[in-house]
């Protein structure tokens, strides 16, 4: 089963993503801190898809994405940004770092499910 990790400092957002993914043929791990997810990745966890929030304390989504791109095991891992931000300059920064897609919160559950299905080719 493909492994999808969600990183968001909001427990509410994580609960919403859990509801969307419960019926999908994927394994899901959730983290409230990007640096914790990054530590697990560096310890050997290899996700098939990473979905992260942008605005988080300590390490934001773009910093997390940069760290993922600097890691040989995740430098090509598809990554989606799930955020309330809509600023074009932030989207451009993400695109420059190899971001796969941008989903705006509050998200439509079908949109998130479709994005996961498309990226993982389920």
Q: What are the language-model segments listed below?
A:
Residues 11-29, 97:
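Two-component/phosphorelay signaling modules centered on CheY-like receiver
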Residues 30-49, 92:
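Acidic, metal-coordinating helix/loop segments flanking the phosphotransfer/catalytic sites
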Residues 53, 83:
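Active-site residues of response regulator receiver
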Residues 56:
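Receiver (REC) domain active-site loop signature in two-component systems and cognate sites
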Residues 107-116:
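C-terminal output helix
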Residues 45-48, 73-78:
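His-Asp phosphorelay/catalytic-motif detector in bacterial-type signaling
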């Amino acid at each position: 089963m493909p492994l999808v990790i969600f990183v968001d400092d909001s427990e509410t957002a994580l609960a919403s993503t859990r509801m969307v993914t419960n019926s999908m043929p994927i394994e899901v791990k959730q983290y409230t801190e990007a640096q914790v997810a990054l530590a697990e990745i560096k310890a050997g966890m290899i996700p098939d898809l990473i979905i992260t929030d942008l605005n988080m304390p300590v390490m934001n989504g773009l910093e997390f994405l940069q760290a993922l791109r600097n890691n040989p095991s995740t430098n090509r891992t598809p990554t989606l940004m799930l955020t309330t931000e809509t600023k074009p300059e932030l989207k451009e920064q993400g695109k420059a770092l190899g971001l796969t897609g941008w989903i705006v919160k509050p998200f439509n559950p079908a949109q998130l499910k479709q994005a996961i299905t498309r990226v993982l080719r389920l």
